[in-house]
Amino acid sequence: ATISKYLGQQGVTTFVAATMSFDEGTLTQVAHAAKEFAAEDNCEGAALRGINMEGPFFSKAKKGAQSDKYIIDPDYDFYKRVNDESGNMIKLVDVAPELNGAMDFIDKVSKECRVSIAHTEADYDTAVEAFNHGVSHITHLFNAMPPFTHRDPGVVGAASDYAEHVELICDGIHIHPAVVRTVFKIFGDDKVCLISVSMRACGLHDGEYSLGGQKVYVKAGKATLENGTIAGSATCLAECVRRAVKFGVPMASALKAATINPAQAARIDDVCGSIEEGKAADILIMGEDLVPKMIIRGGKIIYGA
């Protein structure tokens, strides 16, 4: 409820919450809690409309801020039990396609929700194979995957050929501003989804926090593990949009990347992502500085006069 209310006050009206790599018992508890919270929506903050199952089907070599003690090969029954406990709230499942059993996993899960490549060592050919099996999305492009090079384009190169949507962390820390501009130019403003990957330090002061059972230190807005690995973000989505525009992304493109594009990626665009008849009455009124002046959620003013 605290997260929802904070996001709502920042201008975020809908969010899809990401998990981390944990044991099945913990993830089923998280899934159940998400289902209960979503059912109790009172339009006082951002609506929780889905879950991104970010872990545990990852490469340990590209674990990022995930704990490797929970990382396992793709397991459909594991996913199914967590999703059942959530009431089918899982909208995306992340997977490293080079892992044992990954392609069979993608075949099955892609019939139920989006499958996204993430935390991977996959090369271009493996990524293309994954797309052919049903992957359609890329989680936080460039981060926790091999870099794009002219002889080894990797996941990034495969995404430019096949992905329906790619995510971009636009906090000014995970991705260089020039790369942000390049991604919008290459992929177009219909495919890019701005994400925050914000963790519990978002909206709070610098200091020591925790993420997935690991200590995280936030200094000058940058969140890292003890070894210096970037550990999520302390920046909310609304600020990511403002930074994208500051970096040179056209305002209309940045706004699409934070509204209808992610709604389509999560397959919840029938209820949110744009102002249309039959959809949620979620409206954000901003000035030229993109700072909210009034926020309407479910037809109810939750910020501004």
Regions found by a protein language model. Give the residues of each.
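Conserved, mostly hydrophobic/aromatic
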Residues: 7, 53, 109, 138, ...
